[in-house]
Amino acid sequence: MRAPPLLLLLAACAPPSGAAVDPTPPGWEPAPDAPWCPYKVLSEGPEAGGGRLCFRSPVRGFRCQTPGCVTLASAGGSLRAHVLRNRSVLLQWRLAPAEARRVRVFALNCSWRGTYTRFPCDRVLLGASCRDYLLPDVHDSVRYRLCLQPLPLPLRAELAAAPPELAECVEFTAEPAAMQEIVVAMTAVGGSICVMLVVICLLVAYITENLMHPTFRRPSLRRQP
């Protein structure tokens, strides 16, 4: 059975198995009976339409491995953003069972910070069974803000005045891949230079002790015949 393309993408960008692992805690995995996640992308701008309905496979068994992945959490802790080194971001969220039964759809709002103002990104509507979403092709060195708000089912008239669910937000900045490679290369070069300096210091100490101050034999006290 062939693995889904998304899992292959995440596996390809993962570092070696010896790296530190941030395991997925209980409650972040999608339900076993949720094989698909329906979603709709609503583009911004004057030519934006209603968007078409799409389906994607949920991510299961994901592990955020450093240094190829950085995890950021919202203030409430129910939304997490895994910033991958291939300029994509995997969002994961969880709800209590009682809250999940009242959700009709999730609204994901995106914006990024400019010099003087914020600019909106595409808005995504996700089905109630969705617990993750992959945001591809984020720009380097741009401060993003993602907010996820659960929209409830239609309620009775006496409950309609209840306040809506607050959105969970998380902010992140994708570090340029080239900058990561430069940092790794500079770290390796710096380590090599330190090793060379230690070797040079040991050689200087050896030369100073053995060559500059040689050990002379003491003259014998015996008379020669």
UniProtKB/Swiss-Prot annotation:
Tree of life domain: Eukaryota
Segments forming domain Fibronectin type-III: 72-167
Record's keyword terms, sorted: Glycoprotein, Membrane, Signal, Transmembrane, Transmembrane helix
Regions that span the bilayer: 182-202
Signal peptide limits: 1-19
GO cellular component assignments: membrane
Subcellular location: Membrane
Extracellular side: 20-181
Cytoplasmic side: 203-225
Membrane topology designation: Single-pass type I membrane protein
Sites where a glycan is attached: 86, 109
Listed InterPro entries: Fndc10
Predominant location: membrane
Pfam families assigned to the protein according to its UniProt record, in alphabetical order: Fndc10 (PF17742)
PANTHER family in the cross-refs: FIBRONECTIN TYPE III DOMAIN-CONTAINING PROTEIN 10 (PTHR39233:SF1)
Name of the protein in its database record: Fibronectin type III domain-containing protein 10
